[in-house]
Structures are given as structure tokens and as C-alpha cells.
Amino acid sequence: VLAATNYDLDGSVSGKKRRIDPALLRRFDNRIYVDLPNEEERKQYLELKLNQKGKNKISEDIISNLAARTTGQSIAILQNVIELAMRNAAKAGTELSGERLLDALEEYNYGEKKTWEQGYYESVAIHESGHAYAAWCAGEKPSYVTIVSRGNFGGYMQHENSENKPNYSREDLLGKIRTSLAGRAAEKVFFGREASLNTGASSDLRSATDMAMRVIATYGMDEENLVCLSPEQILNTTLAKEFIERTNRLLKEQMKETENLICSGREKVEALAKKLLEQNHLTQNEIQDIFDET
């Protein structure tokens, strides 16, 4: 019997509702696990598919960027992105371009573009440039940054994938916290405290809080604690108040460092934001060029 499935064999990832019946599994003599493609394999597929369609004029930079930004995605998704880009190009009566491919990946993952007033884009450009600069300073090269609004976000920064990194140090995780806090920190540095207090940083604060709590309670990286507990477990114990206070203390310390970081790199953040307002999005090489030249 030969078969293929995307379902979990034991339900450990998706839960028992997606588990294959053990009675069926017993009929197979052998099981072959096929992982999702890594970055190099995604790049090879994109090159092959575009060449097959006669679209071999797409730049190496665009193909590498798409491959780097699709960690954890299947070949089928990459094919869907290419097809979407080609349909959009046909509707517009233009040739398939790198810009169309980048836009198609955004549309496939997050939906149609939304339009807002200019003042909003200026704020988002500073916010996302802050994220990109903090990630760059932490050694996680930003691979893409955009101020185009889709879904439930106004823009976003995506850093270089970490497929080949087996573990993280405490400083690595603090760098991630600073990167999450850098959007609000940049708005505060450029526009003042009151203007920075908006709902745009809510998901960033959730991410920073979760990471800070894991540094303190889960990964054994706090001087006062070696107990390994998840954030959910902590909140259900008598230690909740203590851990929340320590988490908040760590976040405040990192926010102060992040504000200092943005102040010291103000010219780079401003230059990146200016370019974002001109182009709406930037790839890794474009971001690196701006930071190198400023």
C-alpha cells in the first residue's frame, strides 16, 4: 500500500482530531518522513519554476529574498504564490516582475492592501525602521520591511531566518526583546512619549512579555531562578505576582536600552524610514545598503 499524507501520525502537533487511525497505520510496512524544504531547496524550486514559465529575468536578490522569507512553507505554497503573481500581472497587462512576486507573497499570506492617510504611514515607517535597526544591531539581519497595511497590521519587519541555529544565548533573547520593543521606542524618540502610546505596539509588547517571562521562568537564565515553568503555569501559581514583577523589571531595563540604541542610530533609522516612504518595502540588500551608507 502506497500513500502520502500531511496529517500527523501520532497527533502530537495538530492534536488528536488530525490523528491517523492506528488501525490504518498498522497496514504500512514502512514510513518515510519528508521534511518541509529548507531555504536552499526553496530557492532551487523558485528558480526551476520561473525558468519553466520563461520568467528567468527575475533577479537573484528577489529569489533569495523569497526563499529566505518562506521558512516552514511548502512547495505547494510557493507554487501558489508564483501563480498569484502571474495572475495579477496578467490582470494589469504587465510582465511578471520581482515586485509582483514580493507583492504576491504578501497578498497570499496576509490579504489585500489597505490604504490610510499619509501621517499614519510616516508613523509606521519610523516604527518598522526601529524594529529593523534593533534586529540589525542584535545580529539578526532584517530580510524584509514594509509599511503596506494588510490584515490586522500596519506594516512589519521580518528578520533573517534561523533554520540553522540550534539554540539561543541569553543575550540573543534579550536582543529579540529589544527588537520587539524597538517600534514603540523609535516612535517615542522621534515623536515624543504621548504620541508613542498607541495600540500599534500591542502585539510587540505581547511578544516581548512572553520572551521576557521565558528568560526568567522557562530557560533558567535568571540569577534567582532555575525552575522551568511555562508562562501559563506561572500565572496559575502563588508565584505569579513575583514573576510578573521581575518580568516587568526586565522589560523596563530593555526598553531603556532600546531607546538608547535608537538614539545612537537615529540617522540610520531616519534614512530607512525615508526610503520606506518612497518604496513601501525594502529587501535585505536594500536595508543593508542604507545602514552601510548612513
Region annotations inferred by a language model:
Residues 107-108:
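Terminal C-lobe "cap" of eukaryotic-type protein kinase domains
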